[in-house]
């Protein structure tokens, strides 16, 4: 009896241990697993989904904005590279012209047509802030436009406008007999502004493209002055000697001789 009783008691204890959790689960509130709980979870999932959608939208917009910035920077880099290439090419042209003058090379006697074409791609331009300042509008008449540019030279407050006017003149009237003078004045105006490389470019252009112009001797002398200003005594002497030999008796040759005597 005692053995059977123990077995029955053990069996009853096991049944109670197993049944208790199920009873507790059965007594749990229906709301925790009912329709309200599902709706809450659905609502929460919808909120999460909406938040994810908003985040994705923001990320896409940010990527789009970043791409626009990258494209803009790429454009600026390309523009800066182009401008740098132009500056380098212009410096090469200036050095070639000065070297040919100081060495008395045959390049100074070459046809102006080929040189004008080469110079056109590297011609120095006016500052962006003054390019559209107040230069006269093209009249269609070379004499009128040249005289208008000269009038600007005489007005000390409009030197930048004068530079633009002469640049436009060279562009608009490529066959004008005033081209040597226009280039000479551009050289002088740039020199007055301290732009000696640009000044040397224009003075050298007069000598190379228009060696028989009355302005050629003075223009070559000015190239020598610029070389002397820059501390290149050897080139300055060579240019002065070229002025004396190529244009004897001219005012430019006389000035060159004075410079040589003082060096």
Swiss-Prot record:
Disruption phenotype: Deletion mutant is sensitive to multiple beta-lactams, including cefsulodin. It leads to defects in outer membrane integrity, envelope defects and elevated cell lysis. It is found in: Periplasm. Residues 44-88 form a coiled coil. GO terms for cellular component: outer membrane-bounded periplasmic space; protein-containing complex. The keyword Cell division applies. The keyword GTP-binding does not apply. One of its GO terms (biological process) is FtsZ-dependent cytokinesis. PROSITE patterns: TPR_REGION. TPR repeats lie at residues 143-176, 180-213, 217-250. InterPro entries: CpoB (IPR034706), CpoB_C (IPR014162), TPR-like_helical_dom_sf (IPR011990), TPR_rpt (IPR019734), YbgF_tri (IPR032519). It comes from the Bacteria. Changing residue 211 to D: Does not affect oligomerization. Keywords: Cell cycle, Cell division, Coiled coil, Periplasm, Repeat, Signal, TPR repeat. Disulfide bonds: none annotated. Residues 1-26 form the signal peptide. Belongs to the CpoB family. Homotrimer. Interacts directly with the central domain of TolA and with PBP1B. Binding to TolA disrupts the homotrimer to form a YbgF/TolA heterodimer with weak affinity. Forms a quaternary complex with PBP1B-LpoB and TolA. Contains an N-terminal coiled-coil domain and a C-terminal TPR domain, separated by a flexible linker. The N-terminal domain forms a stable trimer and controls the oligomeric status. The C-terminal domain, which can also trimerize, is involved in interaction with TolA. NCBIfam families: PRK10803.1, tol_pal_ybgF. Mediates coordination of peptidoglycan synthesis and outer membrane constriction during cell division. Promotes physical and functional coordination of the PBP1B-LpoB and Tol machines, and regulates PBP1B activity in response to Tol energy state. This is Cell division coordinator CpoB. It comes from Escherichia coli (strain K12).
């Amino acid at each position: 009896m005692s053995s059977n009783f123990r077995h029955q008691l053990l069996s009853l204890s096991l049944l109670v241990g197993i049944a208790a959790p199920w009873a507790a689960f059965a007594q749990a509130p229906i709301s925790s697993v009912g329709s309200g709980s599902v709706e809450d979870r659905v609502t929460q999932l919808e909120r999460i989904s909406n938040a994810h959608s908003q985040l994705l939208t923001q990320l896409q917009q940010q990527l789009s904005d970043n791409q626009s910035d990258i494209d803009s920077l790429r454009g600026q880099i390309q523009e800066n590279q182009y401008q740098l290439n132009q500056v380098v090419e212009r410096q090469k042209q200036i050095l070639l012209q000065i070297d040919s003058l100081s060495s008395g090379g045959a390049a100074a006697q070459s046809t102006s047509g080929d040189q004008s074409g080469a110079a056109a791609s590297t011609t120095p331009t006016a500052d962006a802030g003054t390019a559209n300042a107040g230069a006269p509008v093209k009249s269609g008449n070379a004499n009128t436009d040249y005289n208008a540019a000269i009038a600007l030279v005489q007005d000390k407050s409009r030197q930048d406008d004068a530079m633009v006017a002469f640049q436009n003149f060279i562009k608009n009237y490529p066959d004008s007999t005033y081209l040597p003078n226009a280039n000479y004045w551009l050289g002088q105006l740039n020199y007055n502004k301290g732009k000696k490389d640009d000044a040397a470019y224009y003075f050298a252009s007069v000598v190379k493209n228009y060696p028989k112009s009355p302005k050629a001797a003075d223009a070559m002398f000015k190239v020598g002055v610029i070389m002397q200003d820059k501390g290149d005594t050897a080139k300055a002497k060579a240019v002065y000697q070229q002025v004396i030999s190529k244009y004897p008796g001219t005012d430019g040759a006389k000035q060159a001789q004075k410079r040589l005597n003082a060096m």
